[in-house]
Amino acid sequence: RGAGQPRGHRQQAALKDQLEKSQADHGCVVLMEVATGEIRAIANYTRTKSGDYREWMNYAISESAEPGSTFKLATYMSLLDQHKIDTSSLVDIQHGRYDLINPRNGSVALRIRDAEDAGGIITAKRAFEESSNVGAARLVYEHYHDDPKQFTDKLYSYHLNERDGLQIPGEGYPRIKNPNSRDWNKLQS
């Protein structure tokens, strides 16, 4: 950073530039020191009604969003910790497309896709390496379909449903649905 330039200034400028190019509603950049995990800079912008961008909310810690691929790690940890699979267990990733069928009406309740076709039958280790959505979903469905609470309880045992206690104000509350949740859906949760 240049003399007199506040920490995070370049990140703010880069974020604002990308938001303007894509006309996104909001965005966030987090610069972390890999060796220590220390957060070096955070930049956040929200588009206002007039179309310009202003700092309004710290999306890095406040916004609730689907965890995406990072949640696959917790999924595989659960499967391995409960001895449902080992790394050589096989899973059919169906060339990157898997439809969960609603048993009540036979319609597709949820379509799961992978970014790339990594093949058919592969090991759980390879499915994890390929970050296969289909592999993770099929393994969870196969091993927890009859007792989904066993899966969610294991996730809770990792404290994933608790706040981290960050030193930055505004941390959001994580939420992992379980079979006792009012909006639980066995096919999609």
Language-model features: locations:
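Extracytoplasmic/periplasmic proteins that interact with beta-lactams or build/remodel peptidoglycan
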Residues: 1-28, 48-51
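Beta-lactam-recognizing serine transpeptidase/beta-lactamase-like catalytic domain environment
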Residues: 5, 27-65, 77-189
